[in-house]
Amino acid sequence: MSSIARPPDPCLVAIILIVRSRAGPRFVFHYPPNPLSENGLRAAPKGRRPSRAKSAKSNDSSSSEESGSTSDEDEEEAHAQSQNASSADVWEKLLSPSRSWHKRRFEVGINDLAFVGWPVFVREDGTWRKQRRKKKKTKPEWEGGELGHNEIPGDVRDDADEAIAASTETLSPHTMTASESQRASMGSIRSSRTLSEMLDGDDKDSMTMFNVVFVLDPPLLEYSMRIREIYDNIIKKFAKALKWEQARTDYVWREAQHISHIKEKAKETRTSVNTLYSELINHSSLARAIYTVYSNISASKIASVSLSPDVSISLQIPPLTSTPYLPGPGDKAYPGLWLTTADSVTPADDPTADENTAPHQVLAKHFALLLLSDEATILKDVEASGGALAPALAHYIRCSKPTKSFAQISALSGIPLSTIQMLASHLVYWRRARAIPPLHQRDVYFVSPNCDLSKLEVATAAYQLAFPTLPSLPKMLSALSGTPRPYGSFIPSKDHKEAYFAILAWLLRGGWVTQLRTFARVKVSPEIKMAVERALRREEVDKYLSKQGSSILSDHSKHNGDTSKNDDDDASSSSSSSLASQDSGEETPMPGRYKPDSKLHLSHSLLDQDTSLKTASLILFPHRAPPLESRWLDEIVSRFPKQPRFSVRGRANIDENDPEYAGLRTAMKDLWPVYIKYFNGMDALEKVPVRENLKRKLVWQVLTRLGLVTGSQSYIELDPSEQVLIGVRHW
């Protein structure tokens, strides 16, 4: 499988509703009416379907269903429906699992299709929700939560938390929290429910299980990823919302009976399939909800579903907002997708963030918010939604600027940083905004290789309406396609600064340009390697000699203790030893003299035998380098001069107190600990000023001293002993 990141691909074929009552399982409803033919599966039942143009077909199906078809087509569809009815009992048993699958991921594979659901069973006490102790709140309220994407993944959770799991869309006209008038209607629903339970209690409590099954056809190499994303974001949340309504108003069972009644009536009158489905969608809110989920999710859109006047939910698979890869020859291209390696959440950006947190849940405080549509339009939608977050969202949107990071907006507006991150995360999740590195005039931007040139004509007209008095879109793209230079060089004057930043935001929003970012790694020269090698060998020799010296002292003390016993034999022993040594040709053993079996063994514990000392190396992760690379780094730092030496071409005398050269005067040994963690080849150096709260000019002077040559600093002549970086620039 290619490493290229892919946009959401639901691979959705159909949605099935199964319920189980005292009489047994029942196949209640499915959409679309003929899923195999509509998704192109009938022609190739043993392989992958040739195309996945089902989204357009499903979107157009509603109009064709409502308008009807010819009588011949209706008869054929009715005949097909009657044939499929004979196999309904098979699907009923297959998709109706045992109680052990309660609130767990249920998955069945048949050929290329996967049937995935989240079965919900009635509790042993006959209720659908655990009864909590009543405190001040006596009425259950739908708490779908306007940030459903913050749900902690897991299949088994407390029932009280499940109400918060289903995601909602604050920017939709439907709100999740019931208003006072809605609560009154909830009370009337409960009273009517109590009356109906008294009249027909046997039927009301007869359902024991329901299962909304999603039929999927994912590519083989992406099977687990596609199944998991639609299960976590759609299947589980939709089933939890239905469970909430079932516990509150017996919703699923009532709708299942209503759908069955309409189908029986249509069967008696020989109603066509298209007419039947039009009637079901118009008269059953559950059938309409399933239809809405299928139509929107299969098209990778947001599905806003209203289950009742009090409860509405919004479901989606989080969209892919950017990609760090260009598509290869065998990959599907997605022109217009933002091409960048900038990730709104990385361990370096936010060390306190949970590594298991999804990228769209927590945004780094040093990122900024780029609205994907006009601010006035978004504010209008927010005010129309009337949700609990509406006032806070409106206030934050008015304060937000793509040139200011979340931390800077928090300091300027007084809004807590955690609140800003939550609101920005909400806007990003619901496709209203994008998290980007803050726009700056010293940054470099260029035309994206992934821009969609097929939309250039349409984009030019829209650009002309937005910026009628400024250079045209082709001229701006042509200027940005030249030699890379800071964006500020394109701004004619300070009066044009705001307008040109608006142009840059517009270009980024449409994927026309992207930021040229700089990355660097520390280069270790052969000279550094040899110096460390010699130092390590000296340490080994010193260690060996110190060990041998201690043993010599021990042997010498023993020898002095034995001299009193052997005073009479000294002469004879000495002469015999000398003769023996001369005959054998061996050297006379003396205390402390080197013995043949006592060799110098260098441990080389820090040395890699495969490391070449004649070639340079790059250190991948200097902030957590292994022992040998740490010694290399120490040797590099030890060679930095105590007093920086530099000169500027064209200037003979430079004032040492001139703030323009502040980054050139400080000793590199003092600056090194601040910068070293960014020299890993993955963290862009453009983020250093933002994260370390330093001036950009000072930062780039320091980086230039370290060997990162850019056009703006090439006039500075620096000390070669400090130039230890290898740089590369890309998106």
Swiss-Prot record:
Protein origin, superkingdom: Eukaryota
Stored InterPro entries: HTH_NPRL3 (IPR056603), Npr3 (IPR005365)
UniProt keyword tRNA-binding, yes or no: no
Biased composition (Basic residues): 45-55, 129-138
UniProt-listed GO biological process terms: cellular response to amino acid starvation; meiotic cell cycle; negative regulation of TORC1 signaling; positive regulation of autophagy; TORC1 signaling
A Pfam family that the UniProt record links to this protein: NPR3
Residues in the signal sequence: 1-23
Record-level GO cellular component terms: GATOR1 complex
Function field: Mediates inactivation of the TORC1 complex in response to amino acid starvation. Required for meiotic nuclear division.
Region (Disordered): 34-90, 129-156, 168-187, 549-599
Similarity section: Belongs to the NPR3 family.
Protein name: Nitrogen permease regulator 3
Gene (UniProt): npr3
Keyword Signal: yes
Keywords from the named record: Meiosis, Signal
Regions of compositional bias (Basic and acidic residues) in chain numbering: 139-156, 555-566
Low complexity compositional bias, start-end: 58-70, 572-583
